[in-house]
C-alpha cells in the first residue's frame, strides 16, 4: 500500500 485512500478501488 502506501496511502490507503482507494482501498475498495484496489480490491475491485
Swiss-Prot record:
Cellular localisation: Cytoplasm
Keywords: Cytoplasm, Proteasome
One cellular component term from this protein's GO annotations in UniProt: proteasome core complex, alpha-subunit complex
Source domain of life: Archaea
Keyword field contains Cytoplasm: yes
Family: Belongs to the peptidase T1A family.
Subunit structure: Composed of two subunits, alpha and beta. The complex is formed of four rings. The two outer rings are each composed of seven alpha subunits. The two inner rings are each composed of seven beta subunits.
Functional note: The proteasome is a multicatalytic proteinase complex which is characterized by its ability to cleave peptides with Arg, Phe, Tyr, Leu, and Glu adjacent to the leaving group at neutral or slightly basic pH.
Protein name from the UniProt record: Proteasome subunit alpha
Organism: Halococcus dombrowskii
Lineage of source species: Archaea, Methanobacteriati, Methanobacteriota, Stenosarchaea group, Halobacteria
Amino acid at each position: 500500500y502506501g496511502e490507503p485512500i482507494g482501498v475498495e478501488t484496489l480490491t475491485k
